[in-house]
Amino acid sequence: MDDINNHLSLRKVIYTDESLLFNWANDPDVRKWSFSKNIISLDEHKIWFNKKLNNSNVLMLIFEVNNTPAGMVRLEKENGEVVLNYLIASQSRGKGLASRMLKMAMNEVKNHWQSFKVLAYTLPGNIASTKSLEKAGFLLSETDTRKNFLVYNFADQ
């Protein structure tokens, strides 16, 4: 049975997730499709992680399939908008989880912050991400050719 048919749950990121997120962030495929291609040092990650975890305008969620971590969504509220970032663990890719995670995350935005414009940025060649965003209800709203990224808006607003 594929993971897609199994139980997908979410929880807030906690301090003990620091090394998990560090490893996920430095996965070669994650770095390939990130705006910054540089490997993240452990010291950089610790500073970033503590800053995000202690910020009331940041909501970080771990998604689990049958209690095994499968991905993360980070939502950051700023200037009346929420910016979405996400990644899928290498062993969980290609199973249709991303769009399900994104839909669940949008429900969390509504529960956590009521109504906000949600934006997602992706690189033009990241077909898996664009398909997942579109399947989750995001619409392409802008192409920034200077910075080479696509901007998606969540359509259910």
Tell me what each language-model feature is.
Residues 27-30, 39, 54, 93:
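Residue-level marker of structural boundaries
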